[in-house]
Amino acid sequence: MGHRWLTDHSWNRPSWTVADLEAAKAGRTVSVVLPALNEEETVGSVVETIKPLLGGLVDELIVLDSGSTDETEIRAVAAGAKVVSREAALPEVPPQPGKGEVLWRSLAATTGDIIAFVDSDLIDPDPMFVPKLLGPLLTCDGVHLVKGFYRRPLKVSGAEDANGGGRVTELVARPLLASLRPELNCVLQPLGGEYAGTRELLTSVPFAPGYGVEIGLLVDTYDRLGLDGIAQVNLGVRAHRNRPLTELASMSRQVIATLLSRCGISDSGVGLTQFFADGDDFTPRVSSVSLADRPPMTTLRPR
């Protein structure tokens, strides 16, 4: 199945033009969501690459703010996006922290039949990111989730490894999928933040908390629709702010908890304890993990 899927559900050199995809919309509407938390340095340039699509391929461009304390909102608005706070997106539900929460709330703040998610910390993103993500959804029957894949450069101490990024993906997510959901081995970037889905799908599945959201959506889609409901598209190169290993370890803990949950395996629910050098001593710090999904949005906002 994996080999066939790579042939007919994976695009390495997609040839769609924006005009082709506009014609393929056939009355469907498209929303683009940028989740953001203190991304003043990059959010404006990401918005600027998508704004030219407004009024044509894209009907709605929203930055969903997760409580930024910098100039994220100011710069996003100046670049041409509508900014919605996590509180305003779903005022009847008190917000929780984390990326999964913001993406879940974005379903209530948008109206598109198709929703594309793009991370707001990207550096020099290709203006074709969104069109490529939309391609399979607009041109192929039965596809409900499209994942982007790409080369991921990593900068460390001034040096760059052209393919060294995606450390949590390569060290945690893909090995675990090989063990627990081997059918998803063919998905190159299971944790990638650039993806698109139909509202029909996204509002019918739970959203995992924090950085578990991407792996949760992927496994839930596979369990509901099989590989034929998923596609992937080559977006070229994706560069963003590289995070320190301490942050990636906390992220990994949430990814593991979510994947175990989706596979019916009990997780301890115990947070990750990390030890930080302090002179000759080591100071423990604990980062929490959450096992509490948000319910399908259709249970709160039936369409």
From Swiss-Prot:
It catalyses: an NDP-alpha-D-glucose + (2R)-3-phosphoglycerate = (2R)-2-O-(alpha-D-glucopyranosyl)-3-phospho-glycerate + a ribonucleoside 5'-diphosphate + H(+); (2R)-3-phosphoglycerate + UDP-alpha-D-glucose = (2R)-2-O-(alpha-D-glucopyranosyl)-3-phospho-glycerate + UDP + H(+); ADP-alpha-D-glucose + (2R)-3-phosphoglycerate = (2R)-2-O-(alpha-D-glucopyranosyl)-3-phospho-glycerate + ADP + H(+); GDP-D-glucose + (2R)-3-phosphoglycerate = (2R)-2-O-(alpha-D-glucopyranosyl)-3-phospho-glycerate + GDP + H(+). GO terms for molecular function: glycosyltransferase activity; metal ion binding. It holds the Pfam family Glycos_transf_2. InterPro entries: Glyco_trans_2-like, Glycosyltransferase_2, Nucleotide-diphossugar_trans. The keyword Transferase applies. Its cofactor is Mg(2+); Mn(2+). Optimum pH is 8. It is an enzyme of class 2 (transferase). The keyword Nucleotide-binding does not apply. It comes from the Bacteria. UDP-alpha-D-glucose binds at residues 35-39, 66, 99, 119-120, 211-214, 238-243. (2R)-3-phosphoglycerate binds at residues 166-169, 242. Its EC number is 2.4.1.266. Keywords: Glycosyltransferase, Magnesium, Manganese, Metal-binding, Transferase. Disruption phenotype: Disruption reduces growth rate and results in an 80% decrease in the production of methylglucose lipopolysaccharides (MGLPs) directly attributable to a drastic if not complete loss of GPG synthesis. Mn(2+) binds at residues 121, 240. Optimum temperature is 45 degrees Celsius. The activity is undetectable below 20 and above 55 degrees Celsius. Requires divalent cations for activity. The maximum activity is observed at 20 mM of MgCl(2). PANTHER family: GLUCOSYL-3-PHOSPHOGLYCERATE SYNTHASE, UNDECAPRENYL-PHOSPHATE 4-DEOXY-4-FORMAMIDO-L-ARABINOSE TRANSFERASE-RELATED. Belongs to the glycosyltransferase 2 family. Involved in the biosynthesis of 6-O-methylglucose lipopolysaccarides (MGLPs). Catalyzes the transfer of the glucose moiety from a nuleotide sugar such as UDP-alpha-D-glucose to the position 2 of 3-phospho-D-glycerate (3-PGA) to form glucosyl-3-phosphoglycerate (GPG). It can use UDP-glucose, ADP-glucose and GDP-glucose as sugar donor substrates with decreasing affinity and with 3-PGA as an acceptor. D-glycerate can only be an acceptor with ADP-glucose and at a very low rate. Homotrimer. This is Glucosyl-3-phosphoglycerate synthase. The lineage of its organism: Bacteria, Bacillati, Actinomycetota, Actinomycetes, Mycobacteriales. The gene is gpgS.
